[in-house]
Amino acid sequence: IFPALPANAAIITIPSLFEPTGEEAASMDWVSTPATLHCAPLGWPGIRSAMHQMTSWFHRADPALLICDVSAEVAQLARICSVPHVKILQHGDRSDPGHRAAYDGAAGLLAPFHSDLAQPEWDDAMRSKTFFAGGLGVDLRVAEREVARQRIGIDPDEELILILSGGGGEGFGQAPLGVGARTCPSARWITIGKVQRDWHATEPGNIEHRGWVDNADDYVAAADLVISSTGNTTCQQILAAAKPWLAIPEWRYFDEQHRKADALAAAGVATTLRHLPSSAHGWTSAISETWTRHRPDRQR
């Protein structure tokens, strides 16, 4: 997942903080988790090993800064070990004591999105220590539509509706997508990423599932309209391409994608629904609204 690294950079692999090894002591599960922590089960040797590796590295390397992605526990560990940290700021209801401790104890907050997508409850104190870095970690160069279509095998004059589902969840359901494709028979529907298979789905011939691809950016550049979830990378790619966009949040911890969808709607850069339309008339309305509300100048 990393590009070529410079000579002074190294990758240190640590055990998973979330996946069991089979050596966990389930007899300790009766002890409740305090409000200041999220994922801190007792009796997990993998967690002890990971924390040991990190604290040992803190001692050896004497780091000037740690950039912490999603773990409030690791952020608090850095602070306890006298290591300054910058915490990645994500959308969601993160008003709980665990997140607040990670944010309040941080030297700064790094938001991988534009400031227009900030949540309204983030106060001045929080925003004053936040650096908004839209496009962080994503190649936002957008191929010409015709070039992108050649790469993915789509004719220049075809209407293409792209359904993009990331890797953090189970993907969209096959049945509602089939209803949507039947509603727009003149368009070619292509899905990339995960799709939940439904035995009762009656798909028409104009929908195609391509699964995981290495060039999702080409598909976005080639599309006339995009339907997707609201993960960070997905959002940045679609906004950079300034496509008509129907955004459907998936389940994530702390309602991350739902709050991201709220922010996208408030900024006027996407049409959002809480779930995929469940009927032909629902799809007709959603797609019409997506075209009508498209504001490419706002997206860029």
List PLM regions with ranges:
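Active-site-proximal region of nucleotide-activated glycan assembly enzymes
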Residues: 80-143
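Alpha-helix C-terminal capping/helix-to-coil transition sites in glycosyltransferase folds
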Residues: 60-62, 105, 221-222
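Short, polar loop motifs at secondary-structure junctions
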Residues: 1-3, 70-73, 114-118, 191-199
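Donor-nucleotide binding loops and adjacent catalytic segments primarily
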Residues: 147-225, 276-277
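Conserved nucleotide-sugar phosphate-binding/catalytic loop shared by glycosyltransferases and other
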Residues: 1-46
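Conserved nucleotide-sugar donor-binding subdomain of glycosyltransferases
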Residues: 30-75
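A donor-sugar binding/catalytic signature common to diverse glycosyltransferases
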Residues: 65-70, 88, 216-259
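Conserved donor-nucleotide binding/catalytic region of nucleotide-linked donor-dependent transferases
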Residues: 271, 276-299
